[in-house]
């Protein structure tokens, strides 16, 4: 990807399934300024008296210049233009845990925030997904014998890793650094990825990184620990700890979770709640096939936070696969009625994360929304953070 350092802001959203694209050319700083636009199959060029902006498209995306249509001027945005594209649908979603390659390997679990080793050289023989929350009902409906696993939680053995919607379940060994607090478990309904254990809230069940003091997960029993995907990086032991900016990691993990769940369960609405049980965000997936290409993203008008500065620096002239979602914040008593309605709707899935991570995610969504052209930021009463990336940037 390449873009000139000066010129007009160019925003291009490519929809792979629809083979179409929306092009937004930002308003010039001075009204009435002339603008020359050149569109070729592999590039976009915008010339103004201030300078030239050029985008080189990724190899898998080609524009159809003759299909340009729907030209209109939107105050605050600039020019909107639609055109057809030829885009390969080769954006494969990388699983949160590559079962085929990482099973049978010695892996090390790191704290994503600081790189502290949480579990060292653990050989994972079985890497298995936990069943969905409805599996118990399906067994009763389709099987002629009683469910032998009713009300029995699934405890991973020493070399197991069970994968939930937003967490890993691993078995604690005596040589693990994490202390084992006393627990107060209550009766379990059915072991599942969403409702695997019911515990009375107790401060000493938290798993805390001893270096940076970030909450990594929760101790579920004397041997079983839940580690949240947003807080942990699992690597083969022969590899070094990968340094990934925090905001990039969080939105990538959450977007992967959302896409996998929406594909597996045909659900597109989610509540994001903290480990304290409070709902922080309502999310509604619009699509997951977008490729966003942008140049000259201005961050002057965006309030900067240390969590996001790494992304603000790297976003000029970039392309990335994205999940487009609608969201509503539910903090400080906002959207209480809507949140209650969503919580009581059985078709809406819940994701549980550490409460601090929920606030990080809300900040990321707000920042992503603020970088969109103004006319694309809202749909009805929801906000639209389109650049919710789920894979590495496209180069």
Where in the sequence are the language-model features?
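N-terminal pre-domain and mature-chain start segments
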Residues: 1-395
């Amino acid at each position: 990807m390449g873009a000139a350092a000066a010129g007009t802001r160019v925003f291009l959203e490519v929809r792979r399934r629809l083979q179409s694209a929306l092009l937004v050319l930002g308003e010039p700083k001075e009204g009435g300024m002339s603008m020359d636009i050149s569109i070729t199959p592999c590039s976009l060029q915008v010339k103004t008296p201030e300078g030239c902006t050029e985008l080189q498209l990724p190899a898998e995306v080609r524009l159809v210049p003759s299909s340009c249509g729907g030209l209109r001027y939107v105050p605050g945005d600039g020019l909107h233009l639609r055109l057809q594209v030829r885009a390969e649908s080769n954006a494969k979603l990388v699983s949160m845990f590559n079962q085929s390659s990482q099973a049978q390997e010695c892996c090390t679990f790191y704290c994503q925030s600081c790189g502290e080793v949480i579990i060292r050289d653990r050989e994972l023989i079985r890497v298995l997904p936990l069943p969905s929350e409805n599996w118990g009902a399906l067994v009763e409906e389709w099987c002629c014998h009683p469910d032998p696993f009713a009300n029995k939680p699934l405890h991973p053995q020493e070399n197991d890793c069970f994968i939930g919607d937003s967490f890993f379940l691993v078995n604690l060994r005596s040589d693990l650094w994490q202390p084992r607090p006393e627990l107060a478990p209550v009766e379990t309904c059915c072991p599942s990825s969403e409702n695997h254990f019911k515990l009375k809230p107790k401060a000493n069940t938290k798993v805390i990184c001893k270096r940076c003091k970030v909450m990594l997960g929760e101790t579920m029993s004397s041997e079983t620990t839940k580690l949240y995907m947003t807080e942990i990086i699992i690597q083969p032991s022969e590899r070094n700890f990968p340094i990934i900016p925090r905001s990039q990691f969080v939105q990538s993990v959450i977007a992967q979770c959302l896409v996998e769940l929406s594909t597996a369960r045909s659900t597109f609405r989610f509540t994001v709640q903290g480990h304290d049980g409070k709902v922080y965000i309502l999310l509604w997936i619009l699509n997951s096939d977008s490729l966003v290409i942008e140049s000259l993203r201005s961050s002057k008008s965006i309030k900067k936070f240390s969590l996001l500065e790494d992304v603000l620096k790297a976003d000029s002239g970039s392309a990335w696969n994205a999940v487009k979602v609608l969201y509503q914040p539910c903090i400080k008593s906002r959207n209480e009625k809507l949140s209650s309605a969503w919580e009581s709707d059985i078709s809406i899935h819940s994701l549980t994360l550490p409460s601090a991570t929920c606030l990080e995610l809300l900040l990321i969504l707000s920042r992503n929304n603020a970088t969109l052209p103004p006319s694309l930021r809202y749909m009805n009463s929801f906000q639209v953070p389109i650049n919710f990336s789920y894979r590495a940037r496209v180069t």
